[in-house]
Amino acid sequence: MSADKHEASLYQAYHAVSDGQDWTYFYCERPENKDDFHHYLQTLIHANDAVHYTAVDPQLGHALGTVGLQRIDEKNGVIEIGSVNWSPRLKRNTAGTEAIYLLLHYAFDKLGYRRCEWKCDSLNESSNSAAARFGFQYEGQFRQAIVTKGRNRDTNWYAIIDKDWPLIKQAFKGWLMAENFDSQGKQKMRLQDLRGRHS
């Protein structure tokens, strides 16, 4: 992540809608001015407990969201994909799915980790659905795990482990192939259906 390269386009992407509703389940509210947004990005860039990345539209080169690798436990080979903050445009873009695939590929194939976690607010339907779509298995709920924005949050836990990864990887690669999309950019087969074909 680079503030010099990405700050302006990220600010524009997050403010393409009039309100911060997409930030409802994020740990903070949407920064409403450029100074506050700059400070927010600096906290991500200089985080001691996570490495944050920018998701960039490969065709236009615009930064459209951020995501982090966090809770990094090198000794036990465990890592988490978290702080996923997609702009509205990225939610309708194959680049968002590709970004998650690339992080999983990095965690399992490059770093050799054994387990990759995904955690989210139990009320966050989009994040829970995304976890299932990407192939993370539901492992349970931690009730009243934290207090966020003045309320109790129950946290749902999901994970992919190393023995799951080959099948999930094959499905991601098949889904991302150009042949899986028609001339309008609509998918022909869903990611979860491709996993079913290869299982």
Residue ranges and their predicted role:
Residues 118-128:
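Conserved beta-strand-loop-alpha-helix junction that forms the acyl-donor binding cleft
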